[in-house]
């Protein structure tokens, strides 16, 4: 039921976005929810890369170690030139949106809001978090949200406590992070978007360029054997060919309008046993005390030697 409500809510957001802001540029992390059981393939690739083909830098900052039942911040950085705009679905220039996915280790989850500090509340204003699925609460999605306001996305994370969950152990864990800016080049259905390069469907000469539906252009290539093959270029990408041009199969016939891209990385966090920390502090205290005692003893001996005239 929860998954159904989540899907319905996501669909409602999409519908409202489409009808209220048709010129917007979206980066939909939740599309992966509808098409993949897991956001990470066996090869390690995060599935967002199947639609967002361009590679762009994504960075992440997490603490080196955390204590059980503590809240910490995982920060995903999605840098890009905010002065750049991209093609919307209607061919107009629109600001980029961003999205991110953080795959936490089992047991780590989004921190409940009553555990958020004032700093975290301020840093996450306007950001909405979604679990990937009911059985994967450790995978958290964000987006689409305005990129010019959220080049850094803060994920408040609650560390598990092995004292209350026997399936959790102290030690080092991997975190998988993905960050995207802008629209994809391929829809989940496999169809190209208008935010990509279109290529010649065959070798031959361009015999016609005719207007299509919704501002599209239909490019016809006549091959050497007389066959005519068409390629429909949607509104947005600029044509690089004219009637009479000779093209090779697979050669670009439009520019590349994409200015966004996806990036992923792996990082690590240590779930630290507080007993080890207390033991280490006790050891350091013992060493410091021993050094102090040695210094005091040395001075005492020096005083005795001075009194005896040695």
Curated annotation (Swiss-Prot):
Residues the record lists as binding heme: 28, 48, 51-52
Note on cofactor: Binds 1 heme group covalently.
Cofactors demanded by this protein: heme
Subcellular location: Cellular thylakoid membrane
One of the protein's GO biological processes: photosynthesis
Presence of keyword Transmembrane helix: yes
PROSITE patterns, per database record: CYTF
Top-level lineage group: Bacteria
Pfam families membership: Apocytochr_F_C, Apocytochr_F_N
Keyword field: Electron transport, Heme, Iron, Membrane, Metal-binding, Photosynthesis, Signal, Thylakoid, Transmembrane, Transmembrane helix, Transport
Entry's transmembrane regions: 277-297
Family per record: Belongs to the cytochrome f family.
Protein known as: Cytochrome f
Organism: Synechococcus sp. (strain CC9311)
Gene name of the record: petA
